[in-house]
């Protein structure tokens, strides 16, 4: 098992790749909320924990939180982010 951190910025359509978006625009969503991402991860059956009082490193003034997800070693970060995004549309 490996752990992965998911920030809402990773799937935010308003962000550019340089601003932290990790998925292609066709998978990105508008205004992703931590709770919505956590709900999708839960529906996917993945073990996770939520850290609410954390700031995204590129925007230390904004507290948005992140989710720590446990994944199989064969699962890629991009694969999981795309799956989460698809489930949010």
UniProtKB/Swiss-Prot annotation:
It holds the Pfam family SRP19. Its main location: cytoplasm. The gene is srp19. GO terms for cellular component: signal recognition particle. Belongs to the SRP19 family. Part of the signal recognition particle protein translocation system, which is composed of SRP and FtsY. Archaeal SRP consists of a 7S RNA molecule of 300 nucleotides and two protein subunits: SRP54 and SRP19. GO terms for molecular function: 7S RNA binding. Involved in targeting and insertion of nascent membrane proteins into the cytoplasmic membrane. Binds directly to 7S RNA and mediates binding of the 54 kDa subunit of the SRP. PANTHER family: SIGNAL RECOGNITION PARTICLE 19 KD PROTEIN, SIGNAL RECOGNITION PARTICLE 19 KDA PROTEIN. Keywords: Cytoplasm, Ribonucleoprotein, RNA-binding, Signal recognition particle. Signal peptide: none annotated. It is found in: Cytoplasm. The lineage of its organism: Archaea, Methanobacteriati, Methanobacteriota, Methanomada group, Methanococci. Gene3D superfamilies: Signal recognition particle, SRP19-like subunit. One of its GO terms (biological process) is SRP-dependent cotranslational protein targeting to membrane, signal sequence recognition. It comes from the Archaea. This is Signal recognition particle 19 kDa protein.
């Amino acid at each position: 098992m490996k752990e992965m951190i998911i920030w809402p910025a990773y799937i935010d359509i308003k962000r550019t790749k340089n601003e932290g978006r990790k998925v292609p625009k066709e998978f990105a969503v508008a205004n992703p909320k931590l709770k919505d991402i956590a709900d999708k991860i839960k529906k996917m059956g993945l073990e996770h924990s939520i850290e609410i009082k954390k700031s995204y490193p590129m925007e230390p003034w904004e507290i948005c939180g992140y989710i720590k997800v446990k994944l199989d070693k064969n699962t890629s970060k991009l694969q999981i982010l795309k799956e989460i995004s698809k489930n949010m549309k």
